[in-house]
Each structure stands twice: as C-alpha cells, then as structure tokens.
Amino acid sequence: MALRTIDSLGDLRGRRVIVRCDLNVPLKGGVIGDDGRIRASLGTLTGLREAGARVIVISHLGRPDGTPDEKYSLRPVAARLGELLRADVAFADDTVGDSARAAVEALGDGDVVVLENLRFHAEETSKDETVRRGFAESIAELGDAFVSDGFGVVHRKQASVFELAQALPSAAGSLIASELEVLDRLTENPERPYTVVLGGSKVSDKLGVIGHLLPRVDSLLIGGGMLFTFLKAQGHEVGASLLEEDQVETVKGYLAEAEERGVKIVLPTDVVVADGFSADAAHEVTRADAIEGTPAGAKGLGLDIGPETADAFATIIRGSTTVFWNGPMGVFELEPFAAGTKTVADALTRVEGLSVVGGGDSAAAVRALGFDDDRFGHISTGGGASLEFLEGKRLPGLEVLGWQ
C-alpha cells in the first residue's frame, strides 16, 4: 500500500488539521541556534493554510522528562514560525488543556496555532501502548484530521506519531514525502559511482547502515570518532582516542566483506591528534598508524581527519554521482578540528548528481560552518530516522500511514 498523502483527506477548508512537525531545534536562553527544521515544515503548513485548513501544530523539543520546563517551551519556536510564514501564529500554553482548546476554538480558516511541548506529558513517550493511546485520543479531540510531517520522529512509536495517526483520518505531509523520495534513490538503483561517507562518534550507531549498504555502494569513507575502531581492527594503536573495543571483531568482518564484494572502505591516512579535548589543546597532524608516536603518546586524542585524508575523501566525493554523508569528520565545534568536516562538506557541494546530508550532527555542522542549505542536493531532517531507513528497518510512523 502506498503512502497516504494530504490529497486523500479531501476538502480541508474550515477543518481542524493537526500537524505533527519535528521542531526540535537547538534552543539556548530562548534563542534558536538553527531554524532548519522550522523552515523544513513551511511547505506543508503553507499548503494547508492555502487550502483553508485551521492548522494545529504539535511537536516536541528536547527531553523535559514528562513535566513542564520553561527552557523547553515551544513559545520561541512559534514566534519564529510566525516570522517565516509572515503570519500571526498563536501559541497555547498547554497541549490538551484549556489553553489549547480555547486557541483551537479561536482559529479561522488559514490560521495557525502551536501547542506546547508534547513531551511535557510523560504519556507521549510511554512504553505502555494503552497510556499512549489515551493521550493520542485527547489530542485527537482537538482536530478533524491528522498530518504527520515530522520525519525526524517516524522511527519512534510515540503517541503523536503512531497512535494519533490511528485516531483520526491521517496522511503524510510533503516533507515526509520528499524525504522518502530522496532516501529511495539511495537504496533503489542509485546512480553510480555511489559513495557513502560515515563519521560521528560511535561505530555502533552506524553498524546497521554499513551492513545494509555494503552490497549497494562503491566506496565507503570512514571518519569521525568511529574511525579509531576501524584502525584498531587493522591492528593499529589509537592512544586515548574514542574506541569501542567490543565492536572491533564486527568491524573486521565488514572489512573482509567489503574486500570480497570489491567495495572500497577508505580509512584515514593521517589524523589530527591533540593532548586534550579543548580548542587550545596542543595538536599536530600525524600518520593514522602512528598516533602514539606523537608527544601526547598513549594519551593522544584523535579529534579530526588530517589534510591528506580530507583531500583524498574530497576527490572521491567529487568523482561520485550519488553521495550520502552522515556524521562529522571531527570535533567541528572546536575550530582547530573542523577542517576535515569543512572539506568534506565543500566536496559535497560540488557533486554533479545527488548529494545528501543525513541530518542530525551533519546538518548542524554544515550550517555552523557557513554552508547554505541550497548548496546540497538534500539535507535530511531525520538523523536517526534516515539511518534506520537505510538500515532497512521498519519505521512505525510510516507504516501507520500506509508505507510499505
């Protein structure tokens, strides 16, 4: 069965449409650090407004542990959404209480209200299906139809993602549809050469993706903290760098499988090693197989890929027709260790084909380093969701919308 789209809901004029967005943006002191996820929601919200729907936006933000916490309030998000829509956006101080009901009652055709953080209610993320269903039904009382457009949460069986879609006539928004279209191109007959770039801190987070994509890719480039588990699997010492000792044997298996399949797993030839985890730590570039030969010795921390590796990765990326990247190459938040990530990001902007930035830390990195979104083929809004899709896992938030 195909994914249900908004068209399946019929005429929406005057109807109350609850839209589950993923507006989980970085927020500090009420200031939004990156509004990319808010911008990503605009297509669906604008379409619903133009159709005359009365739009009720719901989302989570952060992890407030099931109780109200002002620092996780969606109020600043509602204000920014209003600026981007160039329209008045109302805000309700609760999710299913008197404020929410009054705000929804006051909506006219084409109006928008944002309800308070879903995760101020422990029921949203409860492991008990009955509890989640009860909360979903409370939300459903506010609307006539439901649109799921938070791609970043479709891998989670939560009340506003799974049960709410069963409580009302439901469909996927345009953001989810576009995400699936792009991810399909990465798994179903991708144009070649096809390169996957993986970074980030833990190799254990990426094992499923590696296993699922090995039969499909031409090259797999490994950076970030996870590279040190690969180096260890090759017999190299890695100092005090991040290492998942319990994954070494699994990595050895993938290295052997890649060789059998003729897939190139490209590991760094040089790394930036520091004597501490700070921007002012003494650091130097060294060969990847000689980390403990630096002045820091066994206490040396590998915090970025080296310039030789970055250039080699960039050459492979630029020569590819399809590229998927998930995970920074180093600790990009600290300027001395951002060069590898910046070089890889720049190479993706030069791909003459499909370049996909896989959400999460990768999306944050390219924006923090000054790259505009439109320089890439696609920046996913779903870090974990994108990875689980590429692992071939079943995603409950999609299946409930008819996706198979």
Swiss-Prot record:
Record protein name field: Phosphoglycerate kinase
Entry's Gene Ontology cellular component terms: cytosol
InterPro entries in UniProt: Phosphoglycerate_kinase (IPR001576), Phosphoglycerate_kinase_CS (IPR015911), Phosphoglycerate_kinase_N (IPR015824), Phosphoglycerate_kinase_sf (IPR036043)
Residues that hold substrate according to the record: 22-24, 37, 60-63, 119, 156
Localization, UniProt: Cytoplasm
Subunit composition and interactions: Monomer.
Catalyzed reactions: (2R)-3-phosphoglycerate + ATP = (2R)-3-phospho-glyceroyl phosphate + ADP
Biological processes annotated in GO: gluconeogenesis; glycolytic process
GO MF annotation list: ADP binding; ATP binding; phosphoglycerate kinase activity
Cystine pairs: none
The EC number(s) this enzyme carries: 2.7.2.3
Gene that encodes the chain: pgk
Keyword Cytoplasm tagged: yes
Similarity section: Belongs to the phosphoglycerate kinase family.
Pathway: Carbohydrate degradation; glycolysis; pyruvate from D-glyceraldehyde 3-phosphate: step 2/5
Taxonomic placement: Bacteria, Bacillati, Actinomycetota, Actinomycetes, Micrococcales
Species, as recorded: Clavibacter sepedonicus (Clavibacter michiganensis subsp. sepedonicus)
Record carries keyword ATP-binding: yes
Residues binding ATP, per UniProt: 206, 302, 333, 359-362
Assigned keywords, A-Z: ATP-binding, Cytoplasm, Glycolysis, Kinase, Nucleotide-binding, Transferase
